[in-house]
Amino acid sequence: MVPYDKQEVVVVRQKQIGVDLNFEPPLRVGFGISDATIDGAKAVMGRTVLVPGAEANQTHYHTNNDVCWYIMSGNIRCISARSDMTARKEIILAAGDFVYVPSGSIHVIANASDTEEASLIFCYIGVPNVEASGFVWLTKEHDEFVRPRP
């Protein structure tokens, strides 16, 4: 339990956080909860917007945390695999879906539509900020990983 003087609900408004266009292009990310906005935060939470036709973000996985998503709107193409690149799966996520991505699971997302925006809420569990999540970027493997399969 946190100390009494920290037991207050904190609200972070969208206008306080803005949009990060450089973190995982072409995604538009707004980081709402982290140790940058909440003293002592033990999770990272935010919103990701995928503009119509948005291609896949960089292929990656997290070594230090699980990730949860809630699909707010649209349809999102998700490609995942184990960290050794086996068991590759592709699925279309739809508004209302809850998604659990375990630590080590490779994942990328892209907008499945060329005409509609898509968005999701994400949460990195148990880490105070993005740096602590242990991102591993798979730059060399990206093009092959996201290529559609027959």
What are these regions (language model features)?
Residues 38, 64, 114-116:
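Short strand-connecting beta-turns/loops that link adjacent beta-strands
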Residues 57-60, 78-80, 101, 107-114:
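Short beta-strand His + acidic residue motifs that chelate non-heme Fe in jelly-roll/DSBH
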Residues 5, 83-85, 108-150:
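Double-stranded beta-helix
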Residues 1-43, 58, 91, 135-150:
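A short, N-terminal "cap"/entry segment at the start of jelly-roll beta-barrel domains
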Residues 82-103:
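Short acidic-glycine-tyrosine-enriched beta hairpin
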Residues 47-51, 62-78, 82, 123-126:
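Short, conserved beta-strand element in jelly-roll/cupin
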Residues 29-31, 45-49, 68, 90, ...:
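Conserved hydrophobic/aromatic beta-strand scaffold that supports enzyme active sites
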